[in-house]
From Swiss-Prot:
Function comment: This reaction introduces a second double bond into the aromatic ring system.
Binding site for FMN: R125, S126, S127, N238, A239, G278, K293, P294, T295, S296, S297, R319
Name assigned to this protein: Chorismate synthase
CC terms in the record's Gene Ontology section: cytosol
Gene transcribed to yield this protein: aroC
Amino acid sequence: MSGNSIGQNFVVTTFGESHGVALGCIIDGCPPGLELTEADMQHDLDRRRPGTSRYTTARREPDEVRILSGVFEGKTTGTSIGLLIENTDQRSQDYSNIKDLFRPGHADYTYQQKYGLRDYRGGGRSSARETAMRVAAGAVAKKYLKQVHGINIQGYMSQLGPISAETLDFSQIEQNAFFFPDASKLEALDEYMRELKKSGDSIGAKISVVATGVPVGLGEPVFDRLDADIAHALMGINAVKGVEIGDGFGVVTQKGSEGRDLMSPLGFESNHAGGILGGISSGQPIVAHIALKPTSSISVPGQSMTAQGEMAEVVTKGRHDPCVGIRAVPIAEAMLAIVLMDHLLRHRAQNQDVCSHTPILGMR
């Protein structure tokens, strides 16, 4: 099975399954000398881990990460960093009834057809449990980006079902279980989720992620444009069905006179492009959004078929998130961090000595 790595200079490779012994990853290309401990990664892992609120799956995993290699006396050595998280709360018996049954909307059917067999326990490799290692690797990238280059990355839930944030207060994001920036909507979100759980159904969500302090010049046209690699990384998150950079699909109804980001010696007057022009970072905040589908692991009966081609009814019995978007915020942050880290190292390798006499613009 290929496709388990991302990046060229900062390379992250993950391994492991939802109900396997452990999850792990290898990070290649991290510069030496970065102070790094398990605690640096644990904060983001705790933000992502299951069982932390009544709105997420009841599966309880501590997600305690261990550093196996690449760190000596508290600093990265420049060699491969090995990370491991053991699975401790598997209940594989919850899935015995779907051993030969395809869950609609899941990867069961496609994995079976591609590989000729599948790990039916919680979806195996296709489970979002795998993203724990992306979050761990992303935390390493986030620390380097912030400590060495002053780059900050912040994600938040901008919409859950029909409820959208009308204000953006970053101080509220970590104060509630939804990572929601609009405190006035928290009561409505709570009520909506309560009713959703009663019905046994699920709902989709929109997650936004912003990177500030990104220097001008990251991105490698034409096939490794920064926005293309960001879209690739974000689209690779489980349940993501859409990615927007900047105004995204909103540009369809914009006129050129509205959508262009006007410039002056004082800076850019807007950021419709989301901080990327021609596939290269402009120095403005990088803004991306992802749409996550509602999980089809629900207790509402649905029609499907068995591996033998017979009709069957599916009712999910395992422990699942009624809205997978709630735990997706640190995952989106991690994937953006991994891409920015990779492109920063690539830019440094080729363009470190480039000197442009054009003034660097900020936001007005």
